[in-house]
Amino acid sequence: MTTNPKPAYQRILLKLSGEALQGSEGFGIDPTVLDRMAQEVKELVELGVQVGVVIGGGNLFRGAGLAKAGMNRVVGDHMGMLATVMNGLAMRDALHRAYVNARLMSAIPLNGVCDDYSWSDAIRELRQGRVVIFAAGTGNPFFTTDSAACLRGIEIEADVVLKATKVDGVYSADPVANPDAQLYDKLAYNDVLEKELKVMDLAAFTLARDHKMPIRVFNMNKPGALRRVVMGEAEGTLISDVQ
């Protein structure tokens, strides 16, 4: 298969789940996984792609779970936001160790730890070839980091939101429970809603749909998958307004 020499996307928003960082550990951050992800992002930067990153916090804390146990949801979500900052600090450090310039911006002020989020500063940094990591979600409780990824993607005028998962894309059913589940190559936004496919929460998904922000779901654990997606090769599932 011939590889397109030019990337298909100039500016991307990469959404990493917190769970992706824990590797096989089951909790926390696996340094090996972190370094591998930093190297994959470095490859994109070397191709001239502008990279924004949103990381979840589920490897360190889950606010929704404690809310069910009686904790105030707002408090739980604030704790979850801080977990994403911890992951962001780890990712920034991994990128710096890989000799990649990176900035960490938080939606909630954390002076001395990271920069405050600024839309104009983020775009300027991206244009200068720096990776920008967006932490603390949207800065508001009740919104997921998937919502933050779509919001930041729209704000920075990214070409696509790349959602890194543990499976090869969007399936017609749970591929673990159903071996006959079909992997979709392309889907329209309405197909996802009609088929009730689990891509991301409804608030995040409808935000992307309303602003015609394409979403590509792919397997981050597959070596080279991120590069193949960015080069426009057949990898994962593309969700857009094209039928």
Curated annotation (Swiss-Prot):
InterPro entries: AceGlu_kinase-like_sf (IPR036393), Asp/Glu/Uridylate_kinase (IPR001048), Uridylate_kinase (IPR011817), Uridylate_kinase_bac (IPR015963). It holds the Pfam family AA_kinase. It catalyses: UMP + ATP = UDP + ADP. UMP binds at G57, D77, T138, G139, N140, P141, F142, F143, T144, T145. Allosterically activated by GTP. Inhibited by UTP. It comes from the Bacteria. One of its GO terms (molecular function) is ATP binding. Its main location: cytoplasm. The keyword Nucleotide-binding applies. GO terms for biological process: 'de novo' CTP biosynthetic process; UDP biosynthetic process. Pathway: Pyrimidine metabolism; CTP biosynthesis via de novo pathway; UDP from UMP (UMPK route): step 1/1. Residues 23-28 are annotated as: Involved in allosteric activation by GTP. Keywords: Allosteric enzyme, ATP-binding, Cytoplasm, Kinase, Nucleotide-binding, Pyrimidine biosynthesis, Transferase. Gene3D superfamilies: Acetylglutamate kinase-like. GO terms for cellular component: cytosol. ATP binds at K15, L16, S17, G18, G58, R62, T165, Y171, D174. It is found in: Cytoplasm. It is an enzyme of class 2 (transferase). Its EC number is 2.7.4.22. Belongs to the UMP kinase family. Homohexamer. Catalyzes the reversible phosphorylation of UMP to UDP. This is Uridylate kinase. The gene is pyrH.
